[in-house]
Amino acid sequence: MNAFTFPLLLAFCAFAHGAWVLDWEDEFNGGNLADRWNFELGCNGWGNNELQCYTDNRGANARQEDGKLVISAVREWWGDGVNPDKEFTSARMTTKANWLHGKFEMRARLPKGKHLWPAFWMMPQNSEYGGWPRSGEIDITEYRGQRPQQILGTLHFGAAPDNKGDVGTGERDFPIDFSADFHTFGLDWSPDSMQWLLDDQVYHTESLQRNFWDGVYNQNGSPFDKNFFIILNLAVGGNFFGGEPFDPSESDGWAKNTFEVEYVKKWTWN
């Protein structure tokens, strides 16, 4: 724990002379999920050759249960009438609200099993710098289900393929099985920096006081100077697994096919 002391001081200094004020939360205690969240739908692979279809507010894939959001990856054939049918279903949810800067936190227990890919991340509300990744992407927490002690967070920017940039935590191992219990995963986003947190401890910082794409972004910190919304999803397979083979029948060996979220919260520094 002592290794986190200095980053915590940096976190305090980045937002000195004020206090965090909670201004958005979902504790998943009831009500219609669609009041606060959009459901993104389809079987198009989502730019990553993913193996699931995302469905629309369907209890088998996204439900509130015992004060939690439960997103489940289910092996079943599904289609959207446009793309080839897929052998898995799941859910991908985005907040109706969007923000520039603040503290973002999720308390969750992650799935466990080959090629399960939960994510807590953010995309720009308006792609003011152009299509992905020009307008940025903020990955707060991603995870591979066959590596239950490893998480990562990333900023994506620039232009694919030649000028695409990625900075962030890299693949970070912890003495924790993230599928065994609930943990908090967070991001402190100020005009000057992004700080990734695990259980309230800062474990990585990236400065925003730089030009991420010289000659295209017009000021330091761009494209992370616009409003972003939150995404929660659970994918199956795809490019994230680096070409590692996966047969759908291997899902029979999944130890835990659910991404359980106790809450998502957002604070502003005032």
From Swiss-Prot:
Pfam families: Glyco_hydro_16 (PF00722). GO terms for biological process: carbohydrate metabolic process. Residues 22-270 form the GH16 domain. It catalyses: Hydrolysis of (1->3)-beta-D-glucosidic linkages in (1->3)-beta-D-glucans. The active site is at E137 (nucleophile), E142 (proton donor). Optimum temperature is 50 degrees Celsius. Retains 20% of the maximal activity after incubation at 60 degrees Celsius for 30 minutes. Retains approximately 15% of the maximal activity at the temperature below 15 degrees Celsius. One of its GO terms (molecular function) is glucan endo-1,3-beta-D-glucosidase activity. Its EC number is 3.2.1.39. The keyword Hydrolase applies. Belongs to the glycosyl hydrolase 16 family. This is Glucan endo-1,3-beta-glucosidase. It comes from Cryptopygus antarcticus. The lineage of its organism: Eukaryota, Metazoa, Ecdysozoa, Arthropoda, Hexapoda.
